[in-house]
Amino acid sequence: MIIDNVYVFTPDKAFVKGGIILDGDKIRQVYEEKDAPQLNGDVLDGKGCYAIPGLIDLHFHGCKGDDFCDGDKAAIGRIAEYEASVGVLSLIHI
């Protein structure tokens, strides 16, 4: 799968137009438009979209009526599902 024509966030902390080549559930390559490889296979047009790395929420108490302090495993599951839905891959309760 290739996501092309998308703005990717670079290590230089800038967005550049380019694409992402996926190999299963792994990122194989991120490229700038000027260095785009020949696109074969499934190509998704990312026009108008931005791609950023997964985020880490360093200070989080809860959401949607659930709180870590409740100590409820089901609530923690709902919190984790919500965070994943908005691009957060890791979170810490302090």
Where on the chain are the PLM-derived regions?
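N-terminal metal-binding scaffold of metallo-dependent hydrolase/deaminase domains
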Residues: 1-37
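Short acidic/polar active-site loop segments enriched in Thr and Asp
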Residues: 88-90
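Conserved small/polar residues in nucleotide/adenosyl-binding loops
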Residues: 93-94
